[in-house]
């Protein structure tokens, strides 16, 4: 089941055991970016009315 290369996701990225860690970091960063985008997008009309 496990090859001599060690634990990997099998995505062909050559990251080995760091693959899941890197994907997790990228996923969290993407979620934070999307949250900030939607939060700022929804806040724009209120900011425009205040001017």
Swiss-Prot record:
- Record carries keyword Transmembrane: yes
Segments passing through the bilayer: 13-33
**Membrane topology, as annotated:** Single-pass membrane protein
Q: Does the keyword Membrane apply?
A: yes
According to its UniProt record, where is this protein located? Magnetosome membrane
| Miscellaneous comment text of the record | This bacteria makes up to 20 cubo-octahedral magnetosomes of about 45 nm in diameter which contain membrane-bound crystals of magnetite (Fe(3)O(4)).
Q: What is this protein called?
A: Magnetosome protein Mms5
């Amino acid at each position: 089941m496990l090859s001599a290369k060690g634990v990997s996701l099998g995505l062909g990225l050559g990251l080995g055991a760091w693959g899941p860690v890197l994907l997790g970091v990228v996923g969290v960063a993407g979620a934070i970016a999307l949250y900030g985008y939607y939060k700022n997008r929804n806040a724009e009309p209120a900011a425009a009315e205040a001017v």
